[in-house]
Amino acid sequence: MKEELLKRFTKYVKVDTQSNEESTVCPTTPGQMELANILVTELKEIGMQEVTVDEFGYVMATLPSNSTKEVPVIGFLAHLDTATDLTGKNVQPQVHENYDGKDIILNKDLNVVLSPKQFPELAGYKGKTLITTDGTTLLGADDKAGITEIMVAMNHLINHPEIKHGKIRIAFTPDEEIGRGPERFDVEAFGAKYAYTMDGGPLGELEYESFNAASAKITFKGNSVHPGTAKNKMVNAVKMAMEFDARIPKDEAPEYTEGYEGFYHLISLNGDVEQARSYYIIRDFDHLKFVERKTHIASIAKELEEKYGEGSVELKLNDQYYNMREKIEPVKEIVDIVSAAMRNLDIEPKISPIRGGTDGAQLSYKGLPTPNIFGGGENFHGKFEYVALESMVKATEVIIEVARLFEEKE
């Protein structure tokens, strides 16, 4: 299993599937369709049934039941795209066997070092096989570790018919990182009663609470005048954007929050004197606080527009997804069965809120309750991203055990 996981994973991460927030098509980048087509071929090769990919890059396939029982159809999902935070082009995965617990030099020329001093959790991976970046890209364990684990789990179940299971549906979705994954996902065609995203972090993570999420895009329109004659005439759009940001509580940012604390996050600010643009994301677990945060953003925009003139500030505020806890708690047994599967494999479940989102957040509101299971990765979305091969083995085993337990309990 280890060898197959390593082979598939290192193949998948080399396909550039970074999504693109600015694109209006689906998938937003051609690399996602390239990977989708690779996976379709491989799914057919291992013997999966009803293998399809639609024009939008959604891959679906079926592993038929080998049980005589009436078992609920369950699904496993992962996403094709990688994050926009750092390039996913020319990913060169580095394999470090029997990690010694010390600094890992990712890139000598650029002096990029993955160090337990900066990332203390590395100490827990001593003796493991770590897969890292070369210090110039992200790795893409989010979520190609999940894709790999689903592929290997399905292959294992096909080759081990003595493991009884009900019908299993799998899906690989585009554009999750920009919040569009479930937009064109056909829940009815998927046909599962419950599903799981393999999109979590370290070993044991199990999540059924997510943020409520919104995005805010603000355009500031200034007035560019020659600096020598600018008095009482120039309006600097960049300074307007800075003034906007100054009115947001500084301690309510990602770098100062944890647990159930929400935040405002300035993703980007660019422009010039004439025009500037800011892009924020807004996150909170509590729905009322979430609404308050959006109201605060809107009120700042209104105040600045009143100050600088009509049309000087344009705000586009969009909800992205909601806390899936509300939809999963009524069927909490689907979380409990994963906890049981983990314990059967000597994994201690670590149930915590997702300080982020998954396709499952939106799918749960579309009628498909979808908790999130660990994929094994750490430090997602950056050059220090890595995954332990042993954690990927365990995640694969969890998929298999969950399928077995669903059949056993009927």
Curated annotation (Swiss-Prot):
Catalyses which reaction?
Release of the N-terminal residue from a tripeptide
Q: Which PROSITE patterns match?
A: ARGE_DAPE_CPG2_1, ARGE_DAPE_CPG2_2
UniProt remark on cofactor binding: Binds 2 Zn(2+) ions per subunit.
* Keyword terms of this UniProt record: Aminopeptidase, Cytoplasm, Hydrolase, Metal-binding, Metalloprotease, Protease, Zinc
- Cofactor names: Zn(2+)
GO biological process terms, alphabetically, are:
peptide catabolic process; proteolysis
Q: What is this protein called?
A: Peptidase T
What gene is it encoded by? pepT
